[in-house]
Every structure is written in structure tokens, then in C-alpha cells.
Amino acid sequence: MSQLRLLPSRLGAQAARLLAAHDIPVFGWRSRSSRPPATLPSSKGGGGSSYMEEMYFAWLENPRSVHKSWDSFFRKASEEAFSGSAQPRPPSVVHESRSAVSSRTKTSKLVEDHLAVQSLIRAYQIRGHHVAQLDPLGILDADLDSFVPSDLITTIDKLAFYDLQEADLDKEFQLPTTTFIGGSENTLSLREIIRRLENTYCQHIGLEFMFINDVEQCQWIRQKFETPGVMQFSSEEKRTLLARLVRSMRFEDFLARKWSSEKRFGLEGCEVMIPALKTIIDKSSEMGIENVILGMPHRGRLNVLANVIRKDLEQIFCQFDPKLEAADEGSGDVKYHLGMYHERINRVTNRNITLSLVANPSHLEAVDPVVQGKTKAEQFYRGDAQGKKVMSILVHGDAAFAGQGVVYETFHLSDLPSYTTNGTVHVVVNNQIGFTTDPRMARSSPYPTDVARVVNAPIFHVNADDPEAVIYVCSVAAEWRNTFNKDVVVDLVCYRRRGHNEMDEPMFTQPLMYKQIHRQVPVLKKYADKLIAEGTVTLQEFEEEIAKYDRICEEAYGRSKDKKILHIKHWLDSPWPGFFNVDGEPKSMTCPATGIPEDMLTHIGSVASSVPLEDFKIHTGLSRILRGRADMIKNRTVDWALAEYMAFGSLLKEGIRVRLSGQDVERGTFSHRHHVLHDQEVDRRTCVPMNHLWPDQAPYTVCNSSLSEYGVLGFELGYAMASPNALVLWEAQFGDFHNTAQCIIDQFISTGQAKWVRHNGIVLLLPHGMEGMGPEHSSARPERFLQMSNDDSDAYPAFTKDFEVSQLYDCNWIVVNCSTPANYFHVLRRQILLPFRKPLIIFTPKSLLRHPEAKFSFDQMVSGTSFQRVIPEDGAAARAPEQVRRLIFCTGKVYYDLVKERSSQGLEEKVAITRLEQISPFPFDLIKQEAEKYPGAELAWCQEEHKNMGYYDYISPRFMTILRRARPIWYVGRDPAAAPATGNRNTHLVSLKKFLDTAFNLQAFEGKTF
């Protein structure tokens, strides 16, 4: 049988040769064709998959499942395959056709009719969604494609298109194995075939799945939707659905009555989303899911919090009270952005389930990769490699789903090994409008969901005014995700009963649509009338259900009036229980020394300079690098790459998970890291030495990302949310490219704690340095990060005992520019040893990675050593500070240029150079000490960046606060410019020489006023 599996590649040519000679047309193949086309053509009205292959595999499984003419043909073809005969024998039907012309004609007609029916079935499967009745308003087609399949409109059109006649409607036809409309029946009349196909594909559900290039997956979907009677619900299921609709609609009505002038972005017009989400959760819980992480925009968010996550109603209602003050630190956020974390019993499955709704900004779809990253992390911490315990649900708006590029970026993470969450259920609230924009002006694709086709995700469109259809589709979506570990999209085609918000007037821009909406009967009334008519519920029971929920809301409203303050921490989406306390008491504001024993440094270094696997051949160039590392270990020195290796390795020893992600991070953009070794003789055989340090170490993940900043940084941010006991780093290929992810930086990283009381310890590694490489490979834009830092330039702090750590606790993020590998080592370790978590922004070097002066001794990393916020002058100038004429402050790589120039001019005793390693929060205490140490010296700030960029605008007012404006801080650096760097090498060197000359010209500032 295995040999027969090779036949499909030859079937097209054989069919043409065997049958064309006898005037039996099959698939329109040309008799002169000597080989099959690149893709076997389908029958008329079909799609891209080979119909003949499907028939062939069906015959292999059961010869009686196909028509006898096909049985005969495949038998002859298989005999030829085994015998190797050059002249294939025709099928028996061909022998019979020779005996009589009438028999031949009859057989030809029989085959053609059966092929036509197969084609008709396939056409429905491929294109039935184009004519499905999806719009509750009946205004627009479900899609914006002007193409309407003429073969799927009327019975006459169908028959004519397939060369069938009305007399054929009552003929019985054998059903192919690619459909399940027959149920237990193998044959149906053409009339019944059409009726069942219409019911499956052209009513309130539109299915897009035939583009999926996996027969098993297509068959699974066909069976779920085509099998007769699959959408039958019990009375109890219908009553549950009605009760959920009542809660969804009455919640919105209650808010509208109590706070008619408040923005709440209600769900009216898509109330079915609440039972839809609950169905996905119920079904997933039934299949073993224990943790569901949701991301969604503002539309319907309060309803989801109340009726899906089950947030206490009084806490939601408190958010509408303008008189309540927040009890927590931070600025807070509007109510329809807040998140939530809740563990409860799922009433349907009677199992525990944890639900998280991730807080998000107004920037639509920005939360998508964050949710995926958090989901991936939760799966890791639960040992859930297959995604059977933790899953994500993403809710989208139609305009944003089609319009926001981060949706595409997130989809393309879905099947990458280090980023996959084993499938996400996407729910699109397709209200057919984007604020005021008509969908025909908002996208170029027929559907808002077409972006999902790039990852072969099935798309289930459904009319939101048919609650039972919605619930069934959502149940299937949950099953799909559990079965195939792939994404799936549910497109809820609905409408928006009010404007974009409750104060908005939609009639200005959509008059016809809103005239129809005003006439539209709410879905709750439609469904209640249906159930009452069929006797599932009585009118009295329905009214009692409404009264019951109204009473719940009123009671919660009364309790909300007793609240005196708001607690933002009650809306935390990612709590870290036990992290901020020790034995019930808050952790002290201290940080232990970050150095480690020398034997640990040596051990990590030896692993970093070797290959832990046998028979593993590495590149000769890499062998030189490893030998160089080994030499450094012998000499007790480290460069940048080794310092990073030692920081990571020591944390792994302490049980801290480390994850490094970004473009080309495995090797490193500048070929310095080499954390993944590649066997030069075995394809895709790799080794990560960092995972071979200790038997009981934590795992290390280093993964090259897709070529995305926005999506990947959002993912890593979400990953870091899940646990404080992990060092999660994202490295930009060049620091310049971080601005493609600016939304994540602005809306989540810099402001996340202030808005949502959510700590996060993510680390951003941003290669930065002016080296003549042009305006897009030079600057990580430090000025932008410093502008968003929240420390007060005019407030002179009190230097308490715990000032250093308290200052870190009060800031919104930490910004550093290390000039030594040792300090880089320490700041990475400090990030984990702090008693809290803050984002860490590190401007990392490029040329310093191999700079001979940027190698430092183990002595600066051993036990008892720590991160230096400021590195003072330690040369001749420091030994005679009273003779120093100028004190230059700087940060980062420019220090080495300054030291070289000072040496060349012999000014070591006249000019002191102090390095600012931690820029924000500003080290007021240490800078004050340095300035006072050199009372007779001019003070200057030197930077390689242009004056309107870099650090000067940040440090200058803080120096003035320290110095009480008694001494100026002069600027030394490049002039203001529009672009961050020149692309001309000569211009770069000229400007470098110019500001270095100024830095050491001791008369440069004479006669100038500050």
C-alpha cells in the first residue's frame, strides 16, 4: 500500500492518457499533456487542492467509497505502478465504452455528473462564506469583495453552471469522503445535497478553511460543521445561554441608567460576546485548561470584567464615582483600561480556573504580544510545553485587526519555537465600523480577518444575532485550539448600537446604518421570543431572570456608595504573591553586594570557552574566539561578552531563569556573544554551553526573534510580567531600531507601574555609540528615555542611609550606560537582587566589545563588589585635586576617547574625568562628592552625541540643583543637529577632533557666560 501512495504525482498524466483517447473528459486535461501540471487542477468550481488526490486516498481507504468508474481506474493505475508497464491498460469502463457508443456516452455522462456534484460540494466549502447571511443589519455583504459566486445563488444558476438539469435534482449521488453532509448515508439526492450545503455554508455561519494545506485539519472542520444535527442544544444549554445574554445586556442597561453621561464603551450590538467568551472558557476548562489570559480593547471591557472574569460589581461601580481618591501610588488609569486577576470555580465544569485580563492602553492591539508573552511564561512555569493548561484569548475590533501592523507581527510569532503559545483563540468584534470610518475605507481586503490566513488559521464568521450559532462556533474554536495547537479566529459580525462612545453622535457619518440600527430588535429579545415560542422558557421565567440580575446590580450599587477610597491594586493583572514581603513584613530597602566568588567566575569562564558536547565541530573562527576567552580566564580578566556570560551563569546557579531575545542575539549582532554553537558538519545541530554549567541550574533561553521590534518587545514584556524571579532581556539589533517598538516603551514600560501598579523587571539592551556608521546605526536616543524618567530635576533629595535603593524604588525605570564590563556584570545581577522590579535600560557599546582598554580584572567582580553608579577619577588628578583645572563628567564610550586625548596632551594632572554610569535616577549624592572634591576646577559635561540629543538636557538642571547655581556646567560635544549622526566618515572624525580639542583647551570657556 505504501507504494500506492506514490501514485498521486502521476495520476494527472495517466488520466489524460487513459481517458482522453476514448473521448471521456476528466478535469479538462489536454490529451497532448505528457505530464501533470505543477498543481493538479480541481474540477469545475473547485479550489486549489487536488480533487483527484482526495478521490485516490478515499479509494485507498475503502474502494467502495468512490464510484465504480474510479474504482476501475485506480485498480488499473495501481497495476501499472507495480508492473512498470510502459503502456497502461485503460479502466474497465473504457473497455465497455468500446463495445457500444451509447454505453460510452452513458458512462461519460455518469462520470461528468458525479464530478459536477463533487465540484458543487467543493464550491460550497470554498466559497459558501461569500453568500452567508452574516450581517445582522442586512446592509453590507459579509465581505467587501464585489465578487459574488454565481454558482451559489439560485438552483437554476447552480445547475446551469455545472451542466446539470432539473431532472438531476432527484437523482441519487455517491457522496465523496470530503464531505460529511450525509451523516450515516453514503448517497443523497442532488436536491438534498444542495439543501444541506446551504444550511451549512450559507446561513448564519461563514467558514473559511479550505486554504489550509492540511487534509486532516480540513476534514476535521468539515465534520464539525457538515454533520447533520451538530448544532442541536439541550433545553438547559439554551437556558444558560439566555441567562448569560440577560447579564450581558442588563449590565449595559444598568450603566446607561446610572451614568448616562459617562464614557464606558458599551457592548450594545454585540452582547453575545459575553456568552461567546464564556463558552470558549467553559469548553477549554473541560479539556484541561487551568489558566486563561485575555487581552482586549476598551469596547465591552467592563462587561467582560463583570460577567466573564467576575470582578465584584461594586468595585466596577466605584470607578464611576469622581469623588473617590486612589489609595495607591501612581496616576492610575481610566476604568476601561484596567486589568484583573481572579481564581474561581468554573460553574460548568466544576474545576478551578484562573482568569487574567491584561491591562492595556488605548493603543489598539498593542496588548496582543504582551498577552502572548505572559501566556508563554505561564506555560513555562507550569511545565506546560504543549499548552494544555494555559491558553490565551485575544479580542479585537474589526478596524484595528485589519489596520494595526502589530497584529501581523504577533501572528508570525505563533509558530516560532521560542514564542509559540500553542494556539490562540481570536475573537473579532466586527461591528462594521471604525469610530466613524466605513470598512470600505478602512481595509483593502474583503474581510478584516484576512491577516489570519498567513498562518493557516481557520476563520469562522458568524452572525452575532444568532446566539446559538455563535456558541457553537466558539465551542468548535476551543476544540480546534486544543486539538491542533494552532490559532483560530471567530469573527462576530455585529453592529454598534451607540456611537464610538456614549457621547458620540454616529448619525453624522453613518446615517443609513444607524437608521437601521434604531429599528433593530435587540438580540436578547429575539432569542427570548424564540425560546418562549418553542416552550424552552416561559415569559415569567425570562422576566424573573431579568429582575434577578437587576437586583444584583442595585445591591452592588448600594454597597459601592459605602466605599471611601479606590484601590488600584485590586485591578492588578499579574500579582506576585510573597515577593514583596518576608515573613509578612515588607522587604527592606537594601540590596546585597552583587559580586560572586572567584571560583564561580572561573568555572563559568571555562564553560564559556569550551564546547561541552563531544564530536561537535565548530567553526575555526569560533575556535579562535574560545581560545581567546580561555586566555582571559587564565589572566583573570573579562571582556564585555564574558562579563555578560558570568552574570547570566551566576543567576542560573541561583535558580533565576534567564531569557534573552531579539534579532540575531544568539551570535550577537557584532559577533561577540556566540551563546549558540553550530556544528559545522551536521545541519541544525546546536549547543548552548550556558545550559551545561550546573546539573541543578535554572534553564537559559537565548532565541533569535523574527524581524520585529514592536511585537517581540511586547512579547518579552509580557513574559517578564509572569514572575519576578526571571531575568528577561530584549536586545535591539542596533539601538536606533527600538523606536519601531515605541508604543510598548511609552505605554507599557515607562508608565506601567504608575498606571496599573504593575512592577516589571524587563531589561532593554540598546547598542549605542557614535562611530561614523550613519544616522540609523549610531543612536539609541538616550534623550528620549531620560525625558520620560520621572525624577525631579529641581528637588534636592535627602541623602538617607538607604538613599541608593529608595531612589531606585521611586523611579519609573533605570537608565545606565556602563563603561566597563564589570559594571555591566553588576547591573545585570542587581536587577534581580533588588527587593522590587523596575525596567532597566542599558545603552550597550559596540566598539568597546573588543577594545583592548575595555578588559577588566576579576577583582572588580568578586564577592564584596557592587555596581558603581559613578566611577571617579583614580589617576594623578585624584591624588592632587587642588591642582585640577577642569573636571569632565561623561558617560559611556566617550570616556576612552577622552582618556586617550588627555594622555596625548599630557594633561593627566590638570584634567580629571568622572564617569556617570547610572544616569537615571540621577546619583545626586555621588556627583556632589565629586564636584566638592575639585573646588577649583571648571566643570564640563562631555558627550559624543549632538547637543540637542544625548544626556546634556537631562543632567544640566540636576547639576544646577546640586551646585546651587554657584558653578556652571559647561557643554562639550557636537553641535545641535537634526539627524543623530553623520554618514560621512571624514565628517565624523572632524567633529570628534573638534569637541576633544574643546574638552582639553583649558581656556575654552574664558569670557563666556553660562
From Swiss-Prot:
Listed Pfam families: 2-oxogl_dehyd_N, E1_dh, OxoGdeHyase_C, Transket_pyr
GO biological process per UniProt: 2-oxoglutarate metabolic process; glycolytic process; tricarboxylic acid cycle
Keywords assigned: Calcium, Glycolysis, Magnesium, Metal-binding, Mitochondrion, Oxidoreductase, Thiamine pyrophosphate, Transit peptide
Protein name listed in UniProt: 2-oxoglutarate dehydrogenase-like, mitochondrial
Binding-site residues, Mg(2+): D398, N431, I433
Transit peptide feature, positions: 1-73
Organism: Pongo abelii
Catalytic activity: N(6)-[(R)-lipoyl]-L-lysyl-[protein] + 2-oxoglutarate + H(+) = N(6)-[(R)-S(8)-succinyldihydrolipoyl]-L-lysyl-[protein] + CO2
Gene this chain is encoded by: OGDHL
One GO cellular component, as annotated: mitochondrial matrix
InterPro entries, A to Z: 2-oxogl_dehyd_N, 2oxoglutarate_DH_E1, DH_E1, KGD_C_sf, ODO-1/KGD_C, THDP-binding, Transketolase-like_Pyr-bd
Subunit note: The OGDHC complex comprises multiple copies of three catalytic enzyme components, the 2-oxoglutarate dehydrogenase (OGDH/E1), the dihydrolipoamide dehydrogenase (DLST/E2) and the dihydrolipoamide dehydrogenase (DLD/E3). OGDHL/E1-like isoenzyme may replace OGDH in the OGDHC complex in the brain. The presence of either ODGH/E1 or ODGHL/E1-like isoenzyme in the complex may depend on its tissular distribution.
Disulfide bonds: none
UniProt keyword Oxidoreductase present: yes
Cofactor: thiamine diphosphate; Mg(2+)
Assigned protein family: Belongs to the alpha-ketoglutarate dehydrogenase family.
EC number: 1.2.4.2
Residues reported to bind thiamine diphosphate: R299, D398, N431, I433, Q663
The protein's role, per its UniProt record: 2-oxoglutarate dehydrogenase (E1-like) component of the 2-oxoglutarate dehydrogenase multienzyme complex (OGDHC) which mediates the decarboxylation of alpha-ketoglutarate in the tricarboxylic acid cycle. The OGDHC complex catalyzes the overall conversion of 2-oxoglutarate to succinyl-CoA and CO(2) while reducing NAD(+) to NADH. The OGDHC complex is mainly active in the mitochondrion. Involved in the inhibition of cell proliferation and in apoptosis.
SUPFAM superfamilies: Thiamin diphosphate-binding fold (THDP-binding)
Single GO MF annotation: metal ion binding
Annotated binding of Ca(2+), by residue: H130, D143, D145
PANTHER family, per the entry: 2-OXOGLUTARATE DEHYDROGENASE, 2-OXOGLUTARATE DEHYDROGENASE-LIKE, MITOCHONDRIAL
Compartments in which it is found: Mitochondrion matrix
NCBIfam families in the record: 2oxo_dh_E1 (TIGR00239), PRK09404.1 (NF006914), PRK12270.1 (NF008907)
